[in-house]
Amino acid sequence: MVEKLWGGRFEASLDKQTEEFGASIKFEQRLAPFDLKGSLAHVKMLGETGIITAEEATTIADGLIKVEEKLMKGQIEFKIENEDIHMNMETYLHDEIGPLAGKLHTARSRNDQVATDMHLYLKSVLSDLLKALRTLRETIVNLSVNHVDTLMPGYTHLQHAQPISFAQHLMAYYQMFTRDFERFEFNVKHTDMNPLGAAALAGTTFPIDRELTTNLLQFEKVYANSMDAVSDRDFILEFLSNSSLLMMHLSRLCEELLLWSSHEFNFVSLSDNYSTGSSIMPQKKNPDMAELIRGKSGRVYGNLISLLTVMKGLPLTYNKDLQEDKEGMFDSADTILTSLSVMDGMLSTMTVNRVNMEKATEQDFSNATELADYLAAKGLPFREAHELVGQLVLKCIKKGIYLQEVSLKDYQALSQLIEEDVYEILKSRTAVSRRNSLGGTGFESIKKQIEQAKKELQK
């Protein structure tokens, strides 16, 4: 049985099952490089402030570097009896330099140590995440450039509403992902803070230099209150909340890709690289990756709710409940980074069926609003125009024809305001091209949206 660093107070050893139940090393292993980084900064500070001698600091730092090299070579065996990532690393340090390893923990608690590890880890994740989100936004903009003049039905209630440009639909997601990007940027500010030096909860009597470790670890600022530094996990909750919003947006886009790639829609075809087959139906090409992203949104939501539930009743400061803060963070980070990469690949490689998209705008009544606007522009109150057009649509449905097939004679029987130019107005391409209000689906409006997006992506 390995002797516990806190064992002096106890007469009996931990029960085997209890030891395994309380150990966190099974999932904390990915914190190892960040734990070593934090320790290197801490020991440098201990040496420079004279808390330990310069020679001791150098020996400990050299030992940490050797442990780091072993870690990179895969030569570290993580052991449950060492409880957590901190004691596993310290045990290897002890193997390298002997009892002097015990001085590393001077003026430090595992409470501020683990908080430092998680801040460093999440900073790294957020950096990767922002790059991945930028790449996805660039892909959407590039796809939009190629489809400004590709028409498709716009939907409300999943019913044909008004014709739009496919680029307008894509750029809606660009805006959503841009807000996600901005939320994660703000998350960085709350993560880029140094808790090291808070010790267990009350600070330390040693003359530490927290500004020095802040600079060494490249944090933007230091936590101003030691109790806050070790007890809150709002920076992780913010990450999980932002991740949930991002996954919701990805899930909605996946749902549309699933609909569009179905036989009934046939608007897009997803690449074989992102599809699978059936074990019994030879003809099947299943959009599994889109379905998986849609499904994985649920686990990210669950991780948020889980940590919120853990945190809601915790008194200050550290409680063992906080051990439950990591797995959901790790899982969500893995999930969103992979989901972003897969989504980018799906969009980059999918084939767009322009003909089917545009044809779908002609075999419906999505131009009814154009007719109502046409009458309103000629002086008829819009509510009256709406009523007249609604009645005409009902007649057309009964006759099995569309608005563009109604004769001019019948139109003028409906209203003398209608002239032959109505047929141009009813064309889907005309309808789309005229909607150039700010943010609208008009071709000129979309081009402006795309140009603005390109400027944003250059920042």
UniProtKB/Swiss-Prot annotation:
Organism domain of life: Bacteria
One example GO MF annotation: argininosuccinate lyase activity
Disulfide bonds: none
Subcellular location, record wording: Cytoplasm
Entry EC no(s): 4.3.2.1
Keywords of this entry: Amino-acid biosynthesis, Arginine biosynthesis, Cytoplasm, Lyase
Gene3D superfamilies referenced in this protein's UniProt entry, alphabetically: Fumarase/aspartase (C-terminal domain), Fumarase/aspartase (Central domain), Fumarase/aspartase (N-terminal domain)
Gene Ontology CC, one term: cytosol
InterPro entries: Arg_succ_lyase_C, Argininosuccinate_lyase, Fumarase/histidase_N, Fumarate_lyase_CS, Fumarate_lyase_fam, Fumarate_lyase_N, L-Aspartase-like
A biological process from GO: arginine biosynthetic process via ornithine
Record-linked NCBIfam families: argH (TIGR00838)
Family per similarity comment: Belongs to the lyase 1 family. Argininosuccinate lyase subfamily.
Protein name: Argininosuccinate lyase
Organism from which the protein derives: Lactococcus lactis subsp. cremoris (strain MG1363)
Gene (name only): argH
